[in-house]
């Protein structure tokens, strides 16, 4: 019996996380972490912005366009990365709450992550590209994906049903110039 594609993907992601190479970014090691800024927007053109200390996705136009949050990234491996905002001072994390996963913003400097692999796992996301779009899966809870609601100005969250028609899990992710 062949394992499903989803099972293989989760196994590969887990192995990459557990046995990442020596060329990976190491804050206290051989190679310094390099934070990069990216623009992110979902396939419905909603961008991320901060409202009442919560990351939300909506349509920003005119003078509000300056509210768009850039996503700060520190790569661990080609597919594994830490995500943050506010110049890496607030990091996205996945925290279990009952039987669901919740997306949190934690006041942690993104360049300080990577020193404690087990503790940092909640901040780690697996980036998967499919054509022009990207998905972000939680490394600490495989099967949970970063998502936006179909409606504008709703919190960015996590879903374990990425194909559900009420959420958007595909994003355009472009390095900021």
Swiss-Prot record:
Domain of life: Eukaryota
Cysteines paired by S-S bonds: 91-141
GO biological process: inflammatory response to antigenic stimulus; negative regulation of interleukin-1-mediated signaling pathway
Glycan attachment sites: 109
Protein localization: Secreted
Main location: secreted
Keyword entries, A-Z: Disulfide bond, Glycoprotein, Secreted, Signal
Gene3D superfamilies in UniProt: 2.80.10.50
Gene Ontology terms: cellular component: extracellular space
Known function: Anti-inflammatory antagonist of interleukin-1 family of proinflammatory cytokines such as interleukin-1beta/IL1B and interleukin-1alpha/IL1A. Protects from immune dysregulation and uncontrolled systemic inflammation triggered by IL1 for a range of innate stimulatory agents such as pathogens.
Family: Belongs to the IL-1 family.
The protein's name in its UniProt record: Interleukin-1 receptor antagonist protein
Encoding gene per record: IL1RN
């Amino acid at each position: 019996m062949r394992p499903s594609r989803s099972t293989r993907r989760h196994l590969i992601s887990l192995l990459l996380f557990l046995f990442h190479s020596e060329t990976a970014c190491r804050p206290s090691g051989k190679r310094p972490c390099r934070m990069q800024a990216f623009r992110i927007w979902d396939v419905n053109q909603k961008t991320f912005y901060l409202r009442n200390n919560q990351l939300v996705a909506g349509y920003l136009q005119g003078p509000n366009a300056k509210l768009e949050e850039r996503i700060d990234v520190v790569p661990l491996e080609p597919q594994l990365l830490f995500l943050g905002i506010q110049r890496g001072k607030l990091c996205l994390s996945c925290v279990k709450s009952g039987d669901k996963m919740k997306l949190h913003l934690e006041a942690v400097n993104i360049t300080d992550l990577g020193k404690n692999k087990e503790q940092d796992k909640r901040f780690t996301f697996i980036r998967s590209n499919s054509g022009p779009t990207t998905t972000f899966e939680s490394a600490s809870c495989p099967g949970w994906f970063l998502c936006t609601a179909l409606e504008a100005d709703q919190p960015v969250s996590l879903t374990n049903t990425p194909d559900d028609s009420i959420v958007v899990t595909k994003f355009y992710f472009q390095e900021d110039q």
